[in-house]
Amino acid sequence: VYFLELWHGPTCAFKDYALQLMPRLLVEAKKNLGRTEKTLILVATSGDTGKAALDGYHDIPGVEIAVFYPTGGTSEIQRLQMATQEGANVAVYAVRGNFDDAQTGVKKVFGDTAIAAELAKRNIRLSSANSINWGRLVPQIVYYFAAYAQLLKAGRITFGDEVDFCVPTGNFGDILAGYYAKRMGLPVGKLVCASNENNVLTDFLTTGTYTAKREFFKTTSPSMDILVSSNLERLLYHVTGSDAEAGGLGKSLG
């Protein structure tokens, strides 16, 4: 058994690996496309994503970021990390409810054409730093390959040996990155979905039935305190091969 250390970023969250790179990719993409509008990043968080996103996007030119977290739904350290973030372009808001409520609210904003039209008048375009944004998943694929390379270098495996990965999972993004690494050719054996008391994903993968309407538990691992996992819809797409079917199934998760 080996542990992949992903806490060496500036906020000690594994999400630093994506959220330190993602803002720079955004700036370069806007430059290449000749886009001059301001980008407003909306983030729902149960703790570590919020701080990692704030740290990555603070004082990035042409970008503002607003983070929404559930009152009492993060650790006190995470709340203080977010509340004390420096930067002229950052804002943090507490919302009543849990992470799923915050995430649902952010998704509704993205789907509201009236809001999009009003923002367009103000030369503002919405984006997200959550894993609903494909740009969050791409950097996470890399460290599966890096982990495999480290095992090769240490002589623990030989090239072509399959390696199993056990991934603590809430919104299904990190483990999905492992799935994409496997599809890209990395010799991955099993991807083990590890859950806490909010084990909706474990139940789904075990029984084939997704039941989000259940008791929500606040645990000591708030980043996994999620009942509606956004990235599961992406897996459903690959299983069904249909945008429409996956979209319909995704909407039914809540």
Which residues are covered by each model-predicted region?
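PLP-dependent amino-acid enzyme catalytic core
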Residues: 1-254
